[in-house]
């Protein structure tokens, strides 16, 4: 989900797992639109894991260094909140948006989860590098 305090004070600095601190057109600051982290363990006995940021929430019109998942008017979102995998492996994402209110973007989305590492390194508007999943498509 979002974290409007991220990067706005020393208690919640930006880092690779929480990389964004930006201002949105409505005056919000921090990690206003949120993101989803994806984890991968080698097996059930693993004591470590790999990860990337599967999806960055953002308004379609935001700069590419904020809209890091390449969302467009057909799929932009904010504040991913609830998630559930169905038996087919489809990821259902519920949004609970209080940040992006000039359009109706409280919704339930269906997504194919892909694989950790299917994207690459991205750099946010505040200069923080992180690992992101593949860019979103309309397909």
What is the predicted function of each stretch?
Residues 1-139:
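Sequence/structural signature of beta-propeller domains
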């Amino acid at each position: 989900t979002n974290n409007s305090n991220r990067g706005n004070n020393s208690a919640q600095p930006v880092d690779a797992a929480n990389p964004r601190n930006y201002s949105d057109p409505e005056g919000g600051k921090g990690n206003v639109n949120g993101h989803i982290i994806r984890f991968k363990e080698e097996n059930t006995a693993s004591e470590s894991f790999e990860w990337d940021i599967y999806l960055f929430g953002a308004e379609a019109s935001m700069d590419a260094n904020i809209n890091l998942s390449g969302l467009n008017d057909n799929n932009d979102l904010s504040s991913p909140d609830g998630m559930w995998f169905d038996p087919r492996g489809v990821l259902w994402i519920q949004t609970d948006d209080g940040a992006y209110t000039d359009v109706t973007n409280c919704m339930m989305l269906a997504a194919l989860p892909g694989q950790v590492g299917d994207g690459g390194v991205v750099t946010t508007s505040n200069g923080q590098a992180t690992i992101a999943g593949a860019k979103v498509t309309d397909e």
